[in-house]
Amino acid sequence: MIKKASLLTACSVTAFSAWAQDTSPDTLVVTANRFEQPRSTVLAPTTVVTRQDIDRWQSTSVNDVLRRLPGVDITQNGGSGQLSSIFIRGTNASHVLVLIDGVRLNLAGVSGSADLSQFPIALVQRVEYIRGPRSAVYGSDAIGGVVNIITTRDHPGTEISAGWGSNSYQNYDVSTQQQLGDKTRVTLLGDYAHTHGYDVVAYGNTGTQAQPDNDGFLSKTLYGALEHNFTDAWSGFVRGYGYDNRTNYDAYYSPGLPLVDTRKLYSQSWDAGLRYNGELIKSQLITSYSHSKDYNYDPHYGRYDSSATLDEMKQYTVQWANNIIIGHGNIGAGVDWQKQSTAPGTAYVEDGYDQRNTGIYLTGLQQVGDFTFEGAGRSDDNSQFGRHGTWQTSAGWEFIEGYRFIASYGTSYKAPNLGQLYGSYGNPNLNPEKSKQWEGAFEGLTAGVNWRISGYRNDVSDLIDYDDHTLKYYNEGKARIKGVEATANFDTGPLTHTVSYDYVDARNAITDTPLLRRAKQQVKYQLDWQLYDFDWGITYQYLGTRYDKDYSSYPYQTVKMGGVSLWDLAVAYPVTSHLTVRGKIANLFDKDYETVYGYQTAGREYTLXGSYTF
C-alpha cells in the first residue's frame, strides 16, 4: 500500500531537525509541513536528494543538482559562480522559497530571488524539494515551490577529497563528524574551490568594447556544528557557516567609466535551537542570524571606490514550531518572526531600512480509511503592507491498493523585496504578488514502476513590474501557467532508471505572450548501474524551445532559443574500502547552447576527483 508507515510513528522528530535521515522502506521528510513524516504521506509532489546522490552525480554546484529535478528550469549567465535563476513550474525566480536548514536564505532579501550559484556545494548534505504552493506553511515566496538545503551530516567519520578539471578547476575539502561521549557530536568542514572559467559573453552584450577574458570563480567555506542530547526527550544544537566568494564576469562597458566586472560576496550564518521530542508532543525553538556583504566593483579601483556598489543585508529569525499527534495524524502550529535590515548605502536601497514580519500558522494531517486529508492556514503581519492570509487544502484517495488520486488547491504570495520598496526607483505602496493554484494527480506502483502524473494551473496577479516611463515599480502584471508533470522510477535487472517529463505553458495573461527563459518542454533521465565494481551513471536532459530578450540593442528584441539535448557520463571506482576515485564528462557531445541569450555555456568539461574516508 502507499501508506507504508503509520503517521503515529512517523511524526517522531520536529520540523527542520538536523537528525533527519533516509530510512527504508519510506524516506522521511521534514519540509512539507514542518514535521517529520514519510514521503508517501505528503500529498504535494516531493523529491529528496541525499549526499550519496550528489557524490554519484559528481555535481560541482548546487545548480547542477537542482537542474536534474522535476519542474526545475535553471538559467545562468555563463559558468561557475555566474548569476543564475531557478524557475519552478514556470513561476518567476522570485517565487521559489530557498531554505537553509529550514531558515530563509538571507541573500534573497534585497534582490528578491535566490542565486544559488554562490552557495557552496560542500555544505549540501541533503535537499528536500516540494512543488506547488506552500505560503500557508512558510509565508512569502513559496509560490512555485520550496527548496530546503540541509547542511548537517548524518554519519560520523572523516573525509578528505580533492578534484581537478577543465578550465583549471580545482577543489579541496576536509570534513569530519566526531562523537564526544554518548550525547554530543561535533561537525567541522573546510572547502576551497577555484576555476579560471572562460569568456562567458559574446561581443555585443558588453557595450562598445569586447572583453575577451576568463570569467573565473573562487570560493572558500568554513562550517561547524555542535549537537547535544540533554535527555531522551530534550536536545539542542548550535551551528554556523561562512563563505567568501569572488566572481569575475563580463559587464556592460561605457566609455570613460570604470568597468565594474568583479563580485565579492561575504556571507555568514549562525543558528541555535532547542528541541523537545516527546511521544505525543514535539516542539522546537530556533533562533538565527545571518549577514551578507555583496560588492560589485572595478578591480583596478577596488571595492571601496565610489564606482563600486554594496548590497548589505542582516536577517534575524525566530521560529517556534509545535506538533501533536491526534488520531491517525497530527496538528501543527507555530510562530515565525523575521527582521531584515539593510545598511545605509546599499546599492538597491540608499538609506538603511528594516522590514519585519510575524507569521502564525496552523497545519493538519489526518488519515481516515483510504483517505488522507491535509490543510494549512497562515496569517502574516508585515511592517510594510500589513496583514495577509493564505491557505491550502489537499485530499488523497487510495481507490485501489497501491493507487491514489490527489486533488489540491492553495493560495500563496510574494512580498515586495526591499529594493522594490525603498530603492532609487522603489515604490513603498506596492502590494504582494498573489497566486491561486489547482492541481490534480494520479500516482501508483505498476509492475515495479513508481509513477506519478499531475496537471496544474497557477494564476498569478499583482505581479510587480518596472515602468520605463514613470521610473517606478508597480503592481499590474498577471501570469497564467498551465502544466503537466510526469515522473517514474524503476529497476530493470542491474539498471536503475529515473525519468521525468514537464510541459509548461507559462504566459503573460494580459498580452498572451510566453514568459521568458522557461522551456516549454523538458525531459530528464538518469540511468545508474554497477559493473565489475565500477559505478556508472548517465544523465540526459532535453531543454525545449524558450524565448529571451536581446539586450544588445534598443529597442530590445524577443529572440527564440532552440531546444538542446545534453548528456553526462560519470564513473566511480572504490580502490579500497576507504579510497574512491571518480571521473565525469559533462556535456558529452559538446553541444553549443545558451540558457540566457548572449551568455555562453562551458561546452564539454572533464573532472577527476578522489576521496578518502576514515
Swiss-Prot record:
Main location as per UniProt: membrane
GO molecular function: ABC-type vitamin B12 transporter activity; metal ion binding; porin activity
Signal peptide region: 1-20
Residues noted as binding Ca(2+) 1 in the record, renumbered to the chain: 199, 211, 213, 215, 250
Membrane-spanning ranges: 158-165, 169-178, 184-195, 217-227, 232-248, 263-277, 279-296, 309-325, 328-337, 353-369, 371-381, 385-400, 403-417, 434-443, 449-458, 473-490, 494-509, 517-529, 535-550, 558-572, 585-596, 602-614
Binding site for cyanocob(III)alamin: 83, 85, 92, 110-111, 251, 309, 517, 551
Record flagged with keyword Transcription: no
Record's keyword terms, sorted: Calcium, Cell outer membrane, Ion transport, Membrane, Metal-binding, Porin, Signal, TonB box, Transmembrane, Transmembrane beta strand, Transport
Superkingdom: Bacteria
TBDR plug domain span: 38-152
Binding site for Ca(2+) 2: 213, 215, 249-250, 261
Main function: Involved in the active translocation of vitamin B12 (cyanocobalamin) across the outer membrane to the periplasmic space. It derives its energy for transport by interacting with the trans-periplasmic membrane protein TonB.
HAMAP family assigned to the protein according to its UniProt record, in alphabetical order: BtuB
Similarity comment text for this entry: Belongs to the TonB-dependent receptor family. BtuB (TC 1.B.14.3.1) subfamily.
Protein name per the record: Vitamin B12 transporter BtuB
Organism: Escherichia coli O6:H1 (strain CFT073 / ATCC 700928 / UPEC)
